[in-house]
């Protein structure tokens, strides 16, 4: 007789290729028999999304940086994730993506200007379309201190339509 294990399972395969100025990678992840990352799940499928028995996620990542810094050409990071959820009453899917840009040594050695934006995975209906971004400038006034002012914002955060946020932060790092 065959027995089906009631234990949760998580199987994944990663593959990547990296060179000094670029990298690409992919991952496939299959979770089944009740393994749960519930806050990443897509909206209800004629029932409770918590009842999802299995899902398959695929993630793609890549980055590239120029041969030299200070040229005005940014390094670039990109990513895309897609997840298909199988539930007793149907199927659903969710996508997420991001793009990051980073300029190094534009004004002074060791400074960085960065921008990132993207759409995180949502567990809500299609009326909710979250979007997030951040902008920052990191600089070193001396060899022991790095200062990084940044602003960030997001729309439809935490799966709530109109749940928008905006903020600023000023990080200071001391090295002794």
Predicted segments with their positions:
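Predominantly the C-terminal beta-signal and adjacent terminal strand-loop region
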Residues: 131-176
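C-terminal hydrophobic structural anchor segments
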Residues: 102-145
